[in-house]
């Protein structure tokens, strides 16, 4: 029998290949472990160990133990569903873990599961935990597995089995009379599960494809203690309140129409005003920093995408081709090849570099319908996309200026807490050692020169170049990846990009892809959730709502409105026959940042009574003074 060597807590053991982890732990005197980590992979006590390496025991309370426990809770939920609605009537899809819990995609014959069913499902899960079933692992041949799940009427499991590579082990886990196809890891028994709560239900297409059946996805969260679960539920309530999909509808920012297509955003008038302000800001800031604005088509010939490598490496994310004049065209998934075509439209001299091209470029990418999510995951979106072409000598200055631009932009939107990640050369890469050294050093130096800390993602760069990613922390503590600064050693070669140097010879330039916000759509979703819909004054579609106390104050309200409008302030009037307090409440619900109340005293003194959601009642201000006040707020990006 073949032997392997494993190291546990500094001591080496020689065991037979395929010995279950639990047996190895017995040999090593390890007690109370729920599983282990070997060569970066979490496995449970029943999993055969087939490779040498160091094993780190996993105990209750650790991050890895949550992965094991949450996986078992997904199975416990599936078993509960079968007990409640009939084993042969519940067909199981997939049931993975998530960052905070688990979900299972299921199809239930004759019953539509709703959120009202969740307490009943939870109760049944608690019963299964109380029974403390041992969780047992078995390995099957492909034929045995198909036969088993055919008998269990589990058509989706058979689908999965057929797609498992020939060389991969097929395993099932059993608890009581429940059995499921699964790689693991799992707890030793159901009784070892921690605290959990089922949180929501959604629809999910099988395999994420709209041409497949729609299943019911049931989500749960799980931690080791009730206290942690309660804290997360409180957090989820806050997340729900801030959901950009709800806010987008309430604030009339955007909509999605089935007849137009999933993942394709329709910007409504209020959202369009906000978007214009955002895009105007971006254009102005880019022009200030020496970028040149460009516009490019939404489609390009297949030859372009062949040269760029997209058809070879990215076709699954592209929309199907269309034929025009006997030639194939594709809608663009990226702007880069078009910007390169602009660069190559004439011979470039080193004196023109760095050349910085900027476009608010709309791109289209095929995403599975199951992953689409409001503005955060779409099929058509507009990137704040720039490409910088420079000489090797200019790289340090260019990267420092670009990172500074990214961070100052994010600060303008109210984000002040960043995490910066530097991703370095992977095992497989293109480009010379010199290119990688120059670019990685430039990225590192830029971060250090600007005084920021960073984490190195060793080997995490793309095969064509290293990059910086900037993540921001939002108002409720979530991290979002926004800015990217990415070197590319691939496209300059593919497109034969050159510049004429001082020696009058052609040289290959460095090229940098750069996005500050990522995309207008996703950034808007993040911004709406960060501010819970109450955007800063400078970004709000309506900055001021004017509310007259009575009908006789309408004329003065109109005068204030015209004055503000003439001075570039986006204002509205509420002239409805409603009580003043009702109008104020409506303005607050519409997330209008500044409310002006006008009555007899204001009309006589040419003043306005000012209140804001953030600062409360600011009292009376002379009209010109108010204009100065709000312009200062706008100037300071408040």
From Swiss-Prot:
Residues 243-536 are annotated as: Catalytic. Its cofactor is Zn(2+). Residues 1-59 form the TGS domain. Zn(2+) binds at residues 336, 387, 513. It is found in: Cytoplasm. It comes from the Bacteria. One of its GO terms (cellular component) is cytoplasm. It catalyses: tRNA(Thr) + L-threonine + ATP = L-threonyl-tRNA(Thr) + AMP + diphosphate + H(+). Binds 1 zinc ion per subunit. One of its GO terms (biological process) is threonyl-tRNA aminoacylation. InterPro entries: aa-tRNA-synt_IIb, aa-tRNA-synth_II, aa-tRNA-synth_II/BPL/LPL, Anticodon-bd, Anticodon-bd_dom_sf, TGS, Thr-tRNA-ligase_IIa, Thr/Ala-tRNA-synth_IIc_edit. GO terms for molecular function: ATP binding; metal ion binding; threonine-tRNA ligase activity; tRNA binding. It holds the Pfam family tRNA_SAD. Its EC number is 6.1.1.3. Keywords: Aminoacyl-tRNA synthetase, ATP-binding, Cytoplasm, Ligase, Metal-binding, Nucleotide-binding, Protein biosynthesis, RNA-binding, tRNA-binding, Zinc. Homodimer. Catalyzes the attachment of threonine to tRNA(Thr) in a two-step reaction: L-threonine is first activated by ATP to form Thr-AMP and then transferred to the acceptor end of tRNA(Thr). Also edits incorrectly charged L-seryl-tRNA(Thr). Belongs to the class-II aminoacyl-tRNA synthetase family. This is Threonine--tRNA ligase. The gene is thrS.
